[in-house]
Amino acid sequence: MARMNRPAPVEVSYKNMRFLITHNPTNATLSSFIEDLKKYGATTVVRVCEVTYDKAPLEKDGITVVDWPFDDGAPPPGKVVEDWLSLLKNKFCDDPGSCVAVHCVAGLGRAPVLVALALIESGMKYEDAIQFIRQKRRGAINSKQLTYLEKYRPKQRLRFKDPHAHKTKCCIM
């Protein structure tokens, strides 16, 4: 019942990257959250909001939970961006096509901004990244976050030489 007012999880796929954008579960809704993660094959969850559930049940199911909280409605701090991109580079080089779940409270601000950054770092224009995400997650990304993405200058940290690079584990840095 708690999920009725929340948007359903959405998958965003681009090149060899897959993301699951979702809202935060509670301990009461954790079992359905874990089912969603398994359905999409997500083995890593990035939590960018305050803790609302015990991560032990996820870890018991082999799902890694990473905590990088930052303020609601705000763009991510530089350290979160660096850690996020580093995690993705390792994850998608080692296991192309795998899925990384990311959530904030409603799945409309902080989580979509991180996914947009990944798309931009992989070569997509910021306008296209925002449109791509908003097609699947209506209402995502507020004006402050939009300005941040517009001014963001990618270093192409997620440009992959070859979508089949997993054979050589070779990524462009």
Swiss-Prot record:
Residues with lipid group (S-farnesyl cysteine): 170
Chain positions found as Cysteine methyl ester: 170
Catalysed reactions, as listed in the record: O-phospho-L-tyrosyl-[protein] + H2O = L-tyrosyl-[protein] + phosphate
Stated regulation of activity: Inhibited by sodium orthovanadate and peroxovanadium compounds, and by pentamidine.
Root EC class: hydrolase
Location(s), subcellular: Cell membrane; Early endosome
Post-translational modification comment from the UniProt entry: Farnesylated. Farnesylation is required for membrane targeting. Unfarnesylated forms are shifted into the nucleus.
Disulfide bonds: 49-104
Keyword Cell membrane on entry: yes
One record GO biological process: regulation of DNA-templated transcription
Prosegment location in residue numbers: 171-173
GO terms assigned for molecular function: protein tyrosine phosphatase activity
UniProt cross-references to SMART domains, sorted A to Z: PTPc_motif
Keyword Lipoprotein in record: yes
Major location (coarse): membrane
UniProt-listed PROSITE patterns: TYR_PHOSPHATASE_2, TYR_PHOSPHATASE_DUAL
Pfam families: Tc-R-P (PF22785)
Positions bound to substrate: 110
Documented EC number(s): 3.1.3.48
Cellular component per GO, a single term: plasma membrane
Active site, per annotation: 72, 104
Keyword annotations: Cell membrane, Disulfide bond, Endosome, Hydrolase, Lipoprotein, Membrane, Methylation, Prenylation, Protein phosphatase, Proto-oncogene
Domain of life where this protein originates: Eukaryota
Role description: Protein tyrosine phosphatase which stimulates progression from G1 into S phase during mitosis. Enhances cell proliferation, cell motility and invasive activity, and promotes cancer metastasis. May be involved in the progression of cardiac hypertrophy by inhibiting intracellular calcium mobilization in response to angiotensin II.
UniProt subunit comment: Interacts with tubulin.
Name of the protein in question: Protein tyrosine phosphatase type IVA 3
Organism the protein comes from: Bos taurus
Organism lineage: Eukaryota, Metazoa, Chordata, Craniata, Vertebrata
Protein's gene: PTP4A3
